[in-house]
Amino acid sequence: MVGPESGAPYTVPWSRCDVPGLVRLDIEPHSTPSARKIARAVEVLHDGKVVAYPTDTVYALGCAIESRRGTERIYRAKRMDEHKKLALICPDLSSASMYAHFSRTAFRVARRVFPGPYTLVLPATREVPRLLIDHSHRRRQVGIRVPDHPIALALARALGRPLLTSSAIPPGEERALADPEDVELHFGRHVDLVIHGGPTPGEPSTVLEIIDDEVAILRAGLGPTEGILDT
């Protein structure tokens, strides 16, 4: 098929997959992803649906922060325990500060590691939906990510609010998926759109909990920890 004016090959920005209702969206992981294709994915998110997309660590399942239906579908897809909470993907520190309280230490660490393969567990603000708070703990906390990946950041910016996110780990397995074809195979019937943005490193983010001036490593992952505790 060719374009009517240039004669160049014409490709649609998205296509239907073998799974009924599932849309596949091919986006090259360049520094500036196609705005038209990002808008197509954001349209799905605005509808309260679930999108699988690449990050700087692994593929993830995500929905808009206010989508209770999307949140429930992510939990069902992964067969997650209700006490395991989703994190928030924010485009920058400014937006992240609306949902988490940053102490001086937390701000210094965030400036050092974001954007990058880290999750910071911080005190949650009132903007965080109750369904994201683990009430079995005394503290209201939330996981914050600002990934170093153009597609994930473009989604969060265009959406205008954070993405609820969870690594694409199939039920009964320990490792998250790093390839979009595997995401379709395991989660194609549980999501509405899969962004094919190339392979990811396949290692989880490093998780740091920061309470006041204390920094603790909850999980070692792709992000190095050398020097972080010396803030």
Place the predicted regions along the sequence by residue:
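N-terminal amphipathic/basic-hydrophobic helices that include classical n-h-c signal peptides
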Residues: M1-V19
